[in-house]
Amino acid sequence: MISIPFRSTMSRTLVFIILPTVLSCNPSSRLMNFSNSFNLCSYSTCNCDPSFCFEMINLARTSIACDNLTISFSVLFDDSHIPCYNNPRYSFNKLTMTILY
């Protein structure tokens, strides 16, 4: 598992993107399809009281660059209100993404 932290510039939210597998680069191909689901875990310091929490969940844009065995990427997020589920400080969304390089 790869866990990359992203800090919000608009709220007090720390976002982690967890990839299910280790990404590999194929030099012979300019297209790397990664249409695999992964979890976007949003952690916020707000109090989920009573029914919603201010979290960053919307994946606005993803850009990933693959250079040999080094993979770097940057993600922009949007803020939105979502309900608090079982754990009042965490929320999970299933996302998919495609990597082009």
Swiss-Prot record:
UniProt keyword terms in alphabetical order: Signal
Span of the signal peptide: 1-25
Domain of life: Eukaryota
Other facts: Partially overlaps YER137C.
Protein name: Putative uncharacterized protein YER137W-A
Species, as recorded: Saccharomyces cerevisiae (strain ATCC 204508 / S288c)
Lineage: Eukaryota, Fungi, Dikarya, Ascomycota, Saccharomycotina
